[in-house]
Amino acid sequence: MRNTSKEVQSTSYRYAPCDWYYHLPVKRSEKPVGAPPASQIPGLSDLRDSPNVNLPRARRYWIKETDSEYVKLAKQGGRPDLLKHFAPGTRQGSPVAYSLPDWYIHHSKPPTSHQREVPVVSIPDYMVYEEFNPDQANGSYESRQGPFDFDRKTIWQREAEELENVKRKVKLPAINSKNPSKTGTPVSHKEPERSRLSLPPMPGQKNSSPTNFSKLISNGYKDEWLQQQKAEADRRTPKTSRASVSSKSTEDSKSNQDTETPENPETPEGSEKTPDAEVSSPSESTPAELK
């Protein structure tokens, strides 16, 4: 930038200075100016060289017992050559470029097979396959279980095994299902004690035919059950009671007919009512609102 001090003085009446864009260099003063220290931490700046300060008296109370190790080190001047890097064996010789580690530079030579270390690979026990060797077992071999163990026993089988271990045997009633298509037995209200002991058959011991889903959707099993219930009801009712009920019903019907038609010899034969008239008579007796 050229010096325009003369132009500014001659043309100050025409152009206003742009102070926000540039500033004129101020003339340096030749008076000595006290520069601030490079660091505000005592002991790291040029205070040790200042002749106006009494060093023993000023530094007497610098380091205190309550100061941390970092503050004590900073007050004593810090670690020497903290920000300098010295390559090994080159401190007394000519300066050498910064030595980078081998893992950082791709130009470095890869280690040979003799220098390589075999990495130690650790695999979980359940992922390692080992062939069974009976010679190494010696009676103390335990089969390894997988990470997930499934219990396939039902609660009834487990309870039965526990009772056998305690030598307490409970005799359960036999499960005789009348309907082979159903897995459970119907609970009857007449025998509550027996129904408590009845248990459904085991899923593995099912000998009946598999469920026919087309028959299940079309309510075929329901119709079979209704037919079986009806047949059982017919078997329970005795045949003698049916005959007595039928004879009583016939006698009652005959007595009702005799009471309704009394004997009258004087009535002519033509006065007998025809069946058509008997059929039409109830329609005449019905009120007009119901017609």
Swiss-Prot record:
This is Uncharacterized protein C7orf57 homolog. Residues 176-186, 205-217, 280-291 have a biased composition (Polar residues). The modification Phosphoserine is found at S50. InterPro entries: DUF5524. Residues 29-50, 168-291 are annotated as: Disordered. The keyword Phosphoprotein applies. It comes from the Eukaryota. Keywords: Phosphoprotein. It comes from Mus musculus (Mouse). Residues 221-237 have a biased composition (Basic and acidic residues).
